């Protein structure tokens, strides 16, 4: 067990691949866990939905619960116009939640602790929302940069501020997710290190505390996926609904 609690976030190469344009594209532990997350989601959906049973199986019930949750989240934040984007929101939620939960497992790796990963997901949301905004509102989508009732003399400054805030969305989304994942796993690692070094008679209480922390980390893993999903829906609302 490494003494440094941050070692768990290190990227390690599993096998090398030829570079492309001078860029390293080796298959790493991060690559492995992202592939695993994708496979788990795909297999889960395939096995759960391959048969239409009168009495749904446990997997189907879970998938339907997630689907209903996504529908409810979209309807409450975007409205019924946003239901056409269920696949986008469903994919984002399940991918982030699965990546987060895999990181809680022993020998797991938390890919969402890396800004490169969370920023890539955030950019998918940012580009998609921007494209959806122009699709639904055309050039009028740019009105998001100038709040109604803004005095003419203040308009240039407000446009600059709103443009900066809009472009900062993927940055804030990615940092929020990565920071929470790093913080939670680091705390667990530090406390686990104390437990190993303590006398055996003093271990039950710290061990119980670790179990509670792991349970809390599972809750945080799902919560962060939920927060990311809700913020995605809020941005979709800006893109679809005229303000």
From Swiss-Prot:
Lipid bilayer topology: Multi-pass membrane protein
Disulphide connectivity of cysteines: none
Function, as annotated: Key component of the proton channel; it plays a direct role in the translocation of protons across the membrane.
Pfam entry (one): ATP-synt_A
NCBIfam families linked to this entry: ATP_synt_6_or_A, PRK05815.2-4
Keywords assigned: ATP synthesis, Cell inner membrane, Cell membrane, CF(0), Hydrogen ion transport, Ion transport, Membrane, Transmembrane, Transmembrane helix, Transport
Subcellular location as annotated: Cell inner membrane
Any one GO MF annotation of this record: proton-transporting ATP synthase activity, rotational mechanism
Name of this chain's protein: ATP synthase subunit a
Assembly with partners or alone: F-type ATPases have 2 components, CF(1) - the catalytic core - and CF(0) - the membrane proton channel. CF(1) has five subunits: alpha(3), beta(3), gamma(1), delta(1), epsilon(1). CF(0) has three main subunits: a(1), b(2) and c(9-12). The alpha and beta chains form an alternating ring which encloses part of the gamma chain. CF(1) is attached to CF(0) by a central stalk formed by the gamma and epsilon chains, while a peripheral stalk is formed by the delta and b chains.
Lineage: Bacteria, Pseudomonadati, Pseudomonadota, Alphaproteobacteria, Rickettsiales
Ranges annotated as spanning the membrane: 29-49, 54-74, 89-109, 114-134, 144-164, 182-202, 208-228
Predominant location: membrane
GO cellular component term of the entry, any: plasma membrane
Family designation: Belongs to the ATPase A chain family.
CDD domains assigned: ATP-synt_Fo_a_6
The encoding gene: atpB
């Amino acid at each position: 067990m490494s003494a440094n609690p941050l070692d768990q976030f290190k990227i390690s190469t599993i096998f090398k691949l030829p570079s492309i344009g001078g860029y390293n594209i080796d298959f790493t532990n991060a690559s492995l866990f992202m592939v695993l997350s994708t496979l788990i989601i795909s297999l889960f959906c395939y096995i759960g939905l391959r048969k239409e049973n009168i009495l749904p199986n446990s997997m189907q019930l879970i998938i339907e619960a997630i689907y209903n949750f996504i529908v409810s989240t979209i309807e409450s934040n975007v409205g019924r116009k946003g239901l056409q984007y269920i696949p986008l929101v469903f994919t984002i939620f399940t991918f982030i939640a699965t990546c987060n939960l895999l990181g809680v497992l022993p020998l797991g790796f938390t890919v969402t602790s890396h800004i490169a990963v969370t920023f890539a997901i955030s950019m998918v949301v940012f580009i998609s929302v921007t494209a959806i905004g122009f699709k639904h509102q055309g050039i009028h989508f740019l009105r998001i940069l100038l709040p109604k009732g803004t005095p003419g003399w203040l308009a240039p400054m407000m446009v600059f501020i709103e443009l900066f805030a809009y472009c900062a969305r993927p940055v804030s989304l990615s940092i929020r997710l990565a920071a929470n994942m790093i913080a939670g796993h680091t705390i667990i690692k530090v406390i686990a290190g104390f437990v190993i070094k303590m006398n055996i008679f003093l271990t039950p209480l710290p061990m119980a505390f670790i179990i509670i922390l792991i349970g809390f980390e599972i809750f945080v893993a799902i919560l962060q996926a939920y927060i990311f999903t809700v913020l995605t829906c809020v941005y979709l609302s800006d893109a679809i609904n005229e303000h």
